[in-house]
């Protein structure tokens, strides 16, 4: 079935759908990873975005239940050069088209993804719309123009939990209530995790560090956190513009004075804002598995997994030590507060997908909590 991808600037890409009749709209970005499409599809940080995979052949190892990063597909639409309909992998339980179709996600193939990527790289990420109704392309352009801009858009409410939950090691479980309050499930150092779109591999790696976790909605107040009695606080990744989450920025500005804190991606940006910094939108973002980052504390070069469209302005921060920098564009990738037990990185140490060069971040946070609390 014929399909069209229309960008807000009027650029058109003609292809065909591999998910049947449908439509989708969102910010169009590109991901340079050669593998990991299943993790990309289920990463909550891609909410509101249509992802173009630059690798030309996608879907060859199918879909399996082990490699998902959340309960649902999160991308608004999926764009590939060629979709494999006959995967070959011993873990595969369904094809990529079957997976997308089962959750009502529109996919388009047969377009020149290299040309699309170059266009986005030159002109920046922009709104786009996929439609199988190709009779009036300018109407589809109009639909793209009518979509909200990612700047100023808060999307955490679309992906966060409704109520606190715990992590069993393999699955989410509703937090138990004992004597009128949420009960901690174990005996390790208590960690409140703010959910703005948490990835499951982050929960796995925090569990591996021995943390006893309660994952809470991002709307949880500082007073509610205090009543839970944690030893530390963690801010998750998530989608959208961090500056739109004004209440959470305020909450974070209070918590940094009371607990050891760590943040990843959106959590990193929120900590930057809470400490008086500014954020800005990148031209086309960092989305891929091979971004070089330098750890300024050790001099070590890491190959990192990244997925963000916003960044903290280096010049806007005070009382912090810059710990990581991107070697492609010299943007900020991590910082630590000079006086408070606060650390944050912009990229994804949990990978999923991607290299494991940066997984030390979780043990670094664990050591920070141990130093501050004795636990």
UniProtKB/Swiss-Prot annotation:
Small subunit of the glutamine-dependent carbamoyl phosphate synthetase (CPSase). CPSase catalyzes the formation of carbamoyl phosphate from the ammonia moiety of glutamine, carbonate, and phosphate donated by ATP, constituting the first step of 2 biosynthetic pathways, one leading to arginine and/or urea and the other to pyrimidine nucleotides. The small subunit (glutamine amidotransferase) binds and cleaves glutamine to supply the large subunit with the substrate ammonia. Residues 190-375 form the Glutamine amidotransferase type-1 domain. It comes from Solidesulfovibrio magneticus (strain ATCC 700980 / DSM 13731 / RS-1). Its EC number is 6.3.5.5. GO terms for biological process: 'de novo' pyrimidine nucleobase biosynthetic process; 'de novo' UMP biosynthetic process; glutamine metabolic process; L-arginine biosynthetic process. The active site is at residues 265, 348, 350. InterPro entries: Anth_synth/Amidotransfase, CarbamoylP_synth_ssu, CarbamoylP_synth_ssu_N, CarbP_synth_ssu_N_sf, Class_I_gatase-like, CPSase_GATase1, GATASE. It catalyses: hydrogencarbonate + L-glutamine + 2 ATP + H2O = carbamoyl phosphate + L-glutamate + 2 ADP + phosphate + 2 H(+). This is Carbamoyl phosphate synthase small chain. The keyword Membrane does not apply. Residues 1-186 are annotated as: CPSase. One of its GO terms (molecular function) is carbamoyl-phosphate synthase (glutamine-hydrolyzing) activity. Pfam families: CPSase_sm_chain, GATase. Keywords: Amino-acid biosynthesis, Arginine biosynthesis, ATP-binding, Glutamine amidotransferase, Ligase, Nucleotide-binding, Pyrimidine biosynthesis. Composed of two chains; the small (or glutamine) chain promotes the hydrolysis of glutamine to ammonia, which is used by the large (or ammonia) chain to synthesize carbamoyl phosphate. Tetramer of heterodimers (alpha,beta)4.
């Amino acid at each position: 079935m014929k399909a069209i991808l229309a960008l807000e600037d009027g650029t058109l890409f003609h292809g065909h759908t591999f998910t049947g009749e449908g439509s989708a709209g969102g910010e169009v970005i590109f991901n340079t990873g050669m593998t990991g499409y299943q993790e990309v599809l289920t990463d909550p940080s891609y909410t509101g975005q249509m992802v173009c995979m630059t690798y030309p052949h996608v879907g060859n190892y199918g879909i399996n239940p082990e490699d998902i990063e959340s309960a649902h597909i999160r991308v608004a639409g999926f764009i590939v050069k060629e979709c494999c309909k006959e995967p070959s992998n011993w873990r595969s339980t369904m094809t990529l088209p079957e997976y997308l179709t089962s959750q009502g996600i529109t996919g388009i193939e047969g377009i020149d993804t290299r040309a699309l990527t170059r266009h986005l790289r030159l002109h920046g990420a922009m709104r786009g719309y996929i439609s199988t109704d190709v009779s009036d392309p300018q109407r589809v352009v109009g639909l793209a123009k009518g979509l909200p801009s990612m700047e100023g858009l808060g999307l955490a409410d679309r992906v966060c939990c409704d109520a606190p939950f715990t992590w069993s090691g393999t699955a989410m479980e509703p937090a138990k209530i004992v004597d009128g309050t949420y009960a901690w499930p174990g005996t390790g150092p208590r960690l409140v995790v703010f959910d703005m779109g948490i990835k499951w591999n982050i929960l796995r790696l925090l569990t591996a560090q021995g943390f006893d976790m309660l994952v809470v909605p991002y709307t949880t107040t500082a007073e509610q956190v205090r009543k839970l009695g944690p030893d530390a606080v963690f801010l998750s990744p998530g989608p959208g513009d961090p500056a739109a989450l004004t209440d959470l920025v305020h909450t974070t500005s209070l918590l940094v004075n009371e607990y050891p804190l760590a943040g990843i991606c959106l959590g990193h940006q929120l900590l930057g804002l809470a400490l008086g910094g500014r954020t800005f939108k990148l031209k086309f973002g960092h989305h891929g598995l091979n971004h070089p980052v330098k750890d300024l504390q050790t001099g070590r070069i890491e190959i990192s997994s990244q997925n963000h469209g916003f960044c903290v302005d280096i010049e806007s921060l005070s009382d912090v030590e810059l710990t990581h920098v991107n070697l492609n564009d010299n943007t900020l990738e991590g910082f630590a507060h000079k006086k408070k037990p606060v650390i944050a990185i912009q990229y994804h140490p949990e990978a999923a997908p991607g290299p494991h060069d940066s997984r030390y971040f979780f043990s670094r946070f664990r050591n920070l909590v141990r130093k501050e609390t004795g636990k």
